[in-house]
């Protein structure tokens, strides 16, 4: 059996390497666990990209543009649905509909929306699109070539994720 010299340079630096590794893992875990109200930009952009793909497959020739007003309307409704457990669709806790919220956000065109509610902390854009794709009413909204603008927002808590997409036809 060979005995290792605990004072050799390779073993003296081991504890600092181990501590650095553990510290990095701990820091990574803290960075990954973003606050519930964080801007889920990558998720939202993924939804926009996937809706654009569906529109393209439906034969739509215009590019989908992100509208700040529609994004704001989507944000308001996503927060409302997240914080009011009895909501799971288009009507807000104040009785507002998607057109009301879009108008309040400064959008004057015709709008529709799709809403996804998931009973977990995390949701991804493919789960959202799959949910909407297989609902005939939502698929019709996503593939409607007249809807040339979009705003997407998602929010999550420890036990609920909500994603809202508001689609617009400019006035």
Protein language model regions, located:
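Secretory targeting and sorting signals
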Residues: 1-38
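Short amphipathic alpha-helical segments with coiled-coil-like heptad repeat character
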Residues: 3, 82-83, 142
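Short, charge-rich amphipathic segments
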Residues: 9, 58-73, 142, 165-171
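Generic alpha-helix initiation/capping and coil-helix boundary signal
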Residues: 14-17, 21-22, 67, 71, ...
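Polybasic, low-complexity, intrinsically disordered segments
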Residues: 37, 42-45, 140, 171
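Short, well-ordered surface patches within globular domains
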Residues: 39-101
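A well-ordered secondary-structure block
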Residues: 97-171
């Amino acid at each position: 059996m060979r005995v290792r010299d605990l004072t050799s340079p390779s073993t003296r630096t081991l504890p600092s390497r181990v501590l650095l590794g553990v510290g990095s893992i701990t820091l990574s875990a803290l960075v990954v666990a973003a606050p519930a109200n964080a801007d889920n930009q990558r998720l939202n952009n993924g939804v926009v990209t996937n809706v654009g793909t569906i529109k393209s497959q439906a034969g739509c020739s215009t590019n989908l543009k992100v509208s700040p007003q529609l994004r704001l309307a989507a944000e308001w409704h996503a927060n409302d649905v997240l914080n009011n457990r009895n909501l799971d669709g288009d009507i807000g806790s104040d009785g507002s509909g998607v057109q009301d919220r879009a108008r309040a956000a400064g959008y004057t065109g015709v709008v529709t929306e799709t809403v996804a509610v998931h009973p977990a902390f995390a949701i991804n854009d493919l789960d959202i699109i799959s949910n909407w794709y297989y609902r005939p009413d939502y698929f019709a909204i996503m593939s409607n070539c007249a809807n040339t603008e979009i705003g997407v927002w998602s929010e999550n808590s420890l036990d609920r994720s909500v994603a809202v997409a508001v689609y617009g036809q400019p006035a």
